[in-house]
């Protein structure tokens, strides 16, 4: 769907900005690039009626939607570098073990996997979706801070995002406007 493409592009842009701000190396930026670009490729098999539902998903629809990460892993496994596969496959994992699909914990997740998890959330909050408008900056910052304080996502990464929030958004908007012209 067009929404998924826009979300993918913003997740990629946010993840790369965060990676640069955290001084990850060139090879790690490449892994971030491909992992974030491919993180939702499994959504190609999710029905549009679920992807673009103008309401909260039912439990069954959410179960189907969550399958996209497993499908992503299956599509990429064996054809992409294992680190890229893991970045894409693990973007819904949470540091305290409540994420999916594996319920991994902090010690199981690399810095790059954590960066894309934050980039994905930032994109979801910043972007307009079929079921919601984009959130204002202060609400986005509050949600990210709460998730970090509750041990779901990396406090270190969120601190970088909060400190450089306006720059991250500004760079994304400039890039998006150039792409849309």
Language-model segments: what does each one mean?
Residues 1-181:
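Histidine- and acidic-residue-rich, metal-dependent catalytic cores
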């Amino acid at each position: 769907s067009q929404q998924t493409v826009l979300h993918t592009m913003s997740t990629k842009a946010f993840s790369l900005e965060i990676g640069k701000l955290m001084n990850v190396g060139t090879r790690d930026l490449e892994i971030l690039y491909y992992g974030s670009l491919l993180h939702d490729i499994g959504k190609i098999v999710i029905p549009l009626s679920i992807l673009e539902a103008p309401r909260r998903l039912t439990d069954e629809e959410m179960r189907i939607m969550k399958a996209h990460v497993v499908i992503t892993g299956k599509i990429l496994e064996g054809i992409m570098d294992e680190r890229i596969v893991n970045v894409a496959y693990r973007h819904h994992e949470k540091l305290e073990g409540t994420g999916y699909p594996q319920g991994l914990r902090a010690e199981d997740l690399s810095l790059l996997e954590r960066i894309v998890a934050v980039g994905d959330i930032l994109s979801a909050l910043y972007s307009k979706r079929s079921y919601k408008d984009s959130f204002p900056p202060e609400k986005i910052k509050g949600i990210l801070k709460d998730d970090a304080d509750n041990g779901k996502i990396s406090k270190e990464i969120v601190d970088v995002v909060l400190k450089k929030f306006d720059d991250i958004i500004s760079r994304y908007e400039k890039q998006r406007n150039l792409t849309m012209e």
